[in-house]
Amino acid sequence: MVDGMKHLILKVTNRCNLNCIYCYANNKNNKDMDFKTAKNAIDYLLNLDNQIKIQFTGGEPLLNFNLIEKIVDYCNDNYSNCNIQYAIQTNATLINEKIAEKIKELDIKVGISIDGLEINDILRPYKNGKPSTLDTLKGMYILKSYNIPFGITTVVTNKNLPYLEEFVKYLIAFGVKSISFDLLKPKKKEHLTLMPNIEEFNKLLNKLGRYPIYIKNLQKRPKDKYCYLNSGDLLFVNEFGDIYLCPTLEGLSCLGNINDKNKIKLPKVKSKGCYAREFLIKTFKK
């Protein structure tokens, strides 16, 4: 076991309504996580640490929002003595007033995935090819109307890099306080053609440093703080209960299944940067 596990990512569904051109997830099935699997993961983690963050992801996690509600209720009923924070990473296209009210009631922190304005329609279209950006922006406006703060996560590729400065200006005008830049992690060999120019990205970061917004990016983090994986503080469980050190490594290096705890083996991994990104680039360049 890894001591001090603090961050549990639950892939509550593999279903998604978008078709991102660089998708990290394997969307070959439409399976939802069941409550038993989620419960086993939570029980396992809370045996290691009573202060944890549970993040709901997918797919698009709002497609299985009933499970999210059930998980929070379970934790409130059974772990009221623990410090548990909740977060969701969503494309925001499904957010309506009912969901916004429930998110606020359950005190779930929100992260929204969007890669720009017009360019987002190319990078993150719907399954049928139609644009998704306006629906994401609509979800953002609904959250804002309910005074629900949210951060933005943007995957940086060579397609959207030229437009990111204007996008940041838009977010500032909208009232967004923080944005995370996540350099593309190539899940397939063809994704290597989308890799951004790191020198140009660093130039952009230097320019954005004068803007009134908190910019989080993996490039500038201390090496031992690059991600939860490097400190042994991350557990990712997919819809089947399979365990990985990082969502990006799903399907590549399974460490067991949460429903068979006797066979779980979690090594400690140290990396100079993003272990998953390094691993994938080396793999696909062979």
UniProtKB/Swiss-Prot annotation:
Its cofactor is [4Fe-4S] cluster. GO terms for molecular function: 4 iron, 4 sulfur cluster binding; metal ion binding; oxidoreductase activity. Keywords: 4Fe-4S, Iron, Iron-sulfur, Metal-binding, S-adenosyl-L-methionine. InterPro entries: Aldolase_TIM, MoaA_NifB_PqqE_Fe-S-bd_CS, rSAM, Sulphatase_maturase_rSAM. PROSITE patterns: RADICAL_SAM. Residues 2-221 form the Radical SAM core domain. The keyword Ribosomal protein does not apply. [4Fe-4S] cluster binds at C16, C20, C23. Belongs to the radical SAM superfamily. Anaerobic sulfatase-maturating enzyme family. This is Uncharacterized protein MJ0907. It comes from Methanocaldococcus jannaschii (strain ATCC 43067 / DSM 2661 / JAL-1 / JCM 10045 / NBRC 100440) (Methanococcus jannaschii).
